[in-house]
Amino acid sequence: MFKPEKIVKIEVITLTRFRDTLLTYLHEIGVAQLEEVPIKEVQRDTPNEFYRKATSYSITLSRLVDTLKQYLPPKKGGFKEFMFPQEKPKKKYKYKGIEALIKDVETFLERVEPEIRSLESEVSRINNEISSLEDTLESLQILSNLNVEVEYLRGGSFLNVDVGLVDREKAEPLIKEISDVVEGRVHIVRKDIGARTLLVVVSLREDSSKVSSVLAKYGFEKIEVPEGKGLPRDLIPIYTEKIKEKEKELEEVKSRGRKVAERYYDELVFYKELMDNEREKGNYLSYLVRTEMTFGLLAWVPEKDVEKVVEGIKKITGGVAYINISEPSKEEIDNVPVKLKNPEFLSHFEMLTEMYGVPKYNEIDPTPIMAFTYSFFFGFMLTDFVYGLLLGIISALLVKGHSKLKDGTWKFAKIMLWSSVFTMTLGILFGSYCGNALDMAGIKVPRILDPMEQALTVLMIALAIGLAHLFTGYLLGFIVRWKNGDKKGAIFEQLSWLLIIIGITLFALSSRLGVPDLIVKGIFGIGLILFMIGEVLANKGMAVLLVISDFFGFVGNWLSYARLMALALATSGIALVINILVEMIWGIKIASVPLGALIGILVLIGGHIFSTAINALGAFVHALRLHYVEFFGTFYSGEGRKFEPFAAKREVSELEIET
């Protein structure tokens, strides 16, 4: 807690024949972050033919999965599935090496791929035929405006026939220009259809190029005349029936596709996951160095997992391995990957810290402080017992439903569960139960503070909380800088603000505490002098401008905590409006039917659910902002390098490694 997980560096050199099994072992336990070995004049490892095949088969399997996915029955989904998702069962695979795995995949694909490709090809063919028939049907519907049999619209040995559409305003000049170009050797049938005009242009074969040139000039859209004989309107039922037959044929093929998906989809996903993980392993081979008989790797490993890693390496290699374990050097500190370490009941708040950025290896992890202050700020802004209870119930259900998955939803729900406790507690202190609903119902509610009637007091409390929050940040910054040897920064950039905040606090409390003015002014003055010296040392000629800018920046950050009061008032205000609206319509009756009461109950429940949602969203965003902008700005950079282990991603598969 407060410090990241202790990380050590492991360097391994062993025989090349152990490479595949060793990489697979490290990939499956997922506790080591592989790094590129920092040696320039050395040969790098490269993917062999089996890893290249894994990449190719990963792509092939992905396409086959996408093909069959469309034939699966629709997922149940819905609210229940979101709240209580089912964990996918995992199928075991005995891993005997990548060569054996590739052979198994090839055998599987030889059996499955032709059938799926055939299905895909057949569906594509039928869809193309249906599309072609629909185009023909559309053409017939247009041509049915002419009382001309289709065989006369195709032309012949001596005559050329062009049938198509043109914008109505272009029809007249088009007809005139064609007639002029071919010197009247043309016959044109015209039929206006709304804003378009249907034209049949009959010309001599020898004039076809001249006619085509004019038609193109006016944007003539040619219509392909369908096969068959008779009037277009007589052919429409025939083509409609053909489309129905093709759609029936397509449905039969899709029915077969559903059976194929039922047989093979799960296996495809299983082998795809196996290939995806082999593909990822292959991508890391360039991190390794090798000779003709040996290879070397470098990894960062949490200290608590070192024993497991070393035991696995020794077991796989039979002890034929050089293993060097060392702590990060001073030069490596900034490059050490950071894994946050907090008690289980705080670990879910790491998600909020990581959203901003992890600390450097030698910096403080703000998660424990953020866990309390974030939940408190959230509760202060939402500040209603019933709203907190509703949020807590939903969060508890999500925590239970996602407990096996331990996914992002589970972490977020745990954060909201903590926040709901603070919301209910502060709701009791402020006497807020759906706003003033109980007061309006004639029930006297005890409260320490009413944000609607004592807004100025709530504002003073919010600013006091903000000052304490900023003080904590500067104090943490002072500790980190002093410990890391940056004493100048600790004094001029952190201690200066600590003294200024102490001076402001003593000034505000001087009348109650009886602190002499000399002490108050002395502490504030020393802080201000240190701050100004720090600005001069850091910015030289620009110091005068930046002193003013940075000081008022601090004041702005402090005043930003007024949003605690503002959102608390907003929550109470929205709840008050809902309650007044319910009171206004409650007494309405129509023929002795208490319609107002029925509508009032709906408005009361729906309104407060909406108020909970909108105000919880505001509390979530603004509580984050107070940490990311105001609090972290005092001491925290978030410029660390997150620990990203070399780890398999498994949802449906599980490896049993044979060494």
UniProtKB/Swiss-Prot annotation:
An example Gene Ontology molecular-function term: ATPase binding
BP-aspect Gene Ontology terms: vacuolar acidification
Main location: membrane
Membrane topology: Multi-pass membrane protein
Membrane-spanning ranges: 376-396, 415-435, 460-480, 489-509, 518-538, 542-562, 568-588, 590-610
Domain of life per record: Archaea
Cellular component terms per the entry's GO annotation: plasma membrane; proton-transporting V-type ATPase, V0 domain; vacuolar proton-transporting V-type ATPase complex
Record keywords, A-Z: Cell membrane, Hydrogen ion transport, Ion transport, Membrane, Transmembrane, Transmembrane helix, Transport
Family note: Belongs to the V-ATPase 116 kDa subunit family.
Subunit and interaction comment: Has multiple subunits with at least A(3), B(3), C, D, E, F, H, I and proteolipid K(x).
Protein name: A-type ATP synthase subunit I
Protein encoded by which gene: atpI
